[in-house]
């Protein structure tokens, strides 16, 4: 891209590093940023820096929060006896959109993936086991994606949690195999939650 100024090239390269953003999309985003007023551009930059500095993990469920407990763990209206295990925080947002689930969550921050060198020790599994071992959990719903890594993670966790006498269920397959929760529509997620099964 020798025809662009160096600062613009750098901006395009940074946008292209984001997942799902190719070269042309990165260029469009970079040119849009250049069309912003100085105040708008500064507000955009500040929002990125602030999110990076302030967003942390909830000490209970490992969901994203801007300090202390996440709103779901802090809510007395949520059923604390049921935990829905998801791969990442985007899956929490997808399930919350269904308005069907009233329990709490546990965010693993990934799935077991030997091909990507991600093992159980790289995930938030120890904190999940500690929550279940505390003895006040009745059911753990495995809501990892229905792909190879998601299935492997769900089966691994089911074997790990079974000795605690907790009911371990899996979302029903209203979600297509190889699909991702964040792209599922609300009705599909509702059916998947209603049709979960024990594993």
Show which residues each predicted segment covers.
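Catalytic cores of large soluble enzymes that bind and process phosphate-bearing ligands
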Residues: 3, 36, 40, 116-120, ...
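Long C-terminal interaction/binding lobes of large macromolecular proteins
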Residues: 129-141, 145-199
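S-adenosyl-L-methionine-dependent methyltransferase catalytic core, i.e., the SAM/SAH-binding region
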Residues: 9-16, 27, 33-36, 63-64, ...
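Signal for well-folded cores of large energy- and translation-related assemblies
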Residues: 16, 34, 49, 66, ...
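Extended interfacial segments that mediate partner engagement and assembly in macromolecular machines
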Residues: 26, 75-144
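Cys/His-rich Zn2+-binding cysteine-cluster or related metal-binding knuckle/ribbon modules and their
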Residues: 2-8, 17, 30-92
């Amino acid at each position: 891209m020798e025809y662009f100024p160096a600062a613009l090239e750098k901006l395009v390269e940074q946008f292209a590093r984001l997942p799902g953003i190719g070269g042309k999309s990165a260029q469009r985003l970079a040119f849009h940023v250049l069309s912003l007023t100085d105040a708008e551009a500064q507000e955009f930059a500040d929002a990125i820096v602030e999110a990076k500095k302030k967003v942390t993990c909830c000490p209970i469920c490992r969901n994203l929060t801007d300090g202390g407990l996440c709103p779901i763990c802090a809510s007395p209206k949520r059923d604390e006896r049921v935990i829905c295990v998801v791969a990442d925080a985007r899956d929490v947002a997808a399930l919350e959109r269904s308005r069907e689930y009233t329990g709490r969550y546990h965010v693993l921050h990934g799935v077991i993936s030997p091909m990507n060198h991600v093992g159980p020790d790289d995930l938030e599994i120890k904190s999940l086991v500690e929550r279940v071992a505390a003895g006040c959990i009745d059911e753990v719903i495995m809501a990892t994606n229905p792909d190879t890594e998601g299935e492997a993670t769900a089966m691994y966790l089911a074997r790990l949690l079974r000795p605690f006498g907790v009911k371990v269920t899996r979302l029903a397959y209203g979600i297509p195999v190889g699909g991702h929760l964040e792209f599922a529509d609300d009705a599909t997620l509702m059916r998947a939650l209603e049709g979960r099964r024990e594993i």
